[in-house]
Amino acid sequence: MTSIEELIKQIKSYNSNADFDLIKKSYNYGFNAHKGQYRASGEIYFTHPVEVAKILIDLKLDESTIKTALLHDTIEDTSRSLKQLELAFGKEVSQLVDGVTKLTNLELSSLETKHAENFRKLFMAMSKDVRVLLVKLADRLHNMRTIKALPIDKQIRKSKETMEIFAPLAGRMGMQFMREELEDLSFRVLNSEARNSIIRRFITL
């Protein structure tokens, strides 16, 4: 797992004025909140928030977004409360985390195109701050990068959600590189044989 020192080094490369003490505090807070939790891959759970933060650091996002990434699952998956987050990190970060949590709690009722479109609109409407969507997209991207650790039925369900909801959202926000990776990762699950066939054809050209 990437250390806080390495994260700070990366942030300093584009934002030397960030409050690095608070970023370190959010890292340690998230680590302790998720202590004893593991991902399906067997990795400690906090690896996931750190990887989400790294995706957003690569996009050179502000420190509040990075802190939100490190804390984004604390309300949903630990005993920490929104009030505790606000007391520790202020209203801006706590509201961002709350926004990500609310999006996570939304469930897709249908994968038909018209319903998927309504769901995307609901995502946009609920996200008063675009940074909430950015954290959610980074969250989904890392989950898709590690999807092979899940049972196949969950892989298929999440890949369909990603193809119908998250990849188009990334495109609408101008994140074409993220849209393309989300689509590719979904396609690998949903149509792996067809994808391999296409790759083989290109290789033989």
Give the residues covered by each predicted segment.
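Active-site helical microenvironments for divalent-metal-assisted chemistry
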Residues: 1-205
